[in-house]
Amino acid sequence: TAGRKNSNSEILLKEALLVCQEMGAEVRMINLKDYNIIDCNGCTSCTMGMSMGKYTGCSLDDADDKKKIMDVMLNQDAVIFSAPTYDLMPSSLFLKFMHRNLAYESAFLTKIGAIEPRDRVGALIAVGGSTRSWQSMALECMQATTFTNSFKIVDMYMATQVPAPGQVLLYDEKIARAREIGKNVMEALNTKPEERKWLGDPDYGWCPNCHSNSLCLGEPQWKGLQYPIECTVCGAGGDLERTPDGKWKFVIAANGLERDRTTEEGRGVHCDEIAETQGGF
């Protein structure tokens, strides 16, 4: 969690973890407030190393606690991320930590034998003082940061209208929803990796692929691929179609998951793009 001690974020995370523990899991909670996390300095050492098939680590490994936490995180079967919402999106501490994940890109580390193969499950909890209107990019930003470590997000929850520290304790339904997060994570862990699926509300969000609530008008992508409408999180492409009851839904095109960011194959296309556009610079 990136929340304060005994904050709404930490309280909801504890409730979810308690359910996991009750169902037989070994759990550990890490609060980023207890650690020193430095901003990425943009040295590109990790990306240059990966382009040559070498693991260089992060140039800041010895400067802060990021690696210490990642050594634990990448050795887990599941992680539940919980963060407060500031200015529509997750807190800067959460983003600062997660934006350093490229140096620990799990598909690459697995490929070169630096870490053991692991099918990771993930879930998200965002907490804010208002409705979705003032948390509109919270879960979406959180989910986008989980791609690098190949987390299969099976559920996510936005706790709304709890602006005061610990206020979430006044709402039994919010506590119950956090506990449901823990239950769904355990259900996913007890399911074969190839059969794991979204376990939250099936109608949650606009995107049927990642369940984000964020779409945008499509623009030409690398090598000319274009869709009328795109999911801003997973990159699914398609269009809006009117349903028989007069509402709208996002329908993914036949080739709409060619560059699905939730898959290692889809992210691989992006790596190819960066390599080509960077050229010999």
Sequence positions of predicted segments:
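Active-site rim beta-loop-alpha module in soluble metabolic enzymes
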Residues: Q161-A164
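Short, glycine-/small-residue-rich phosphate/pyrophosphate-handling segment
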Residues: S92-L93, F108-Y157
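Residue-level recognition of beta-strand->loop/alpha-helix junctions
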Residues: N31, Y157-M158
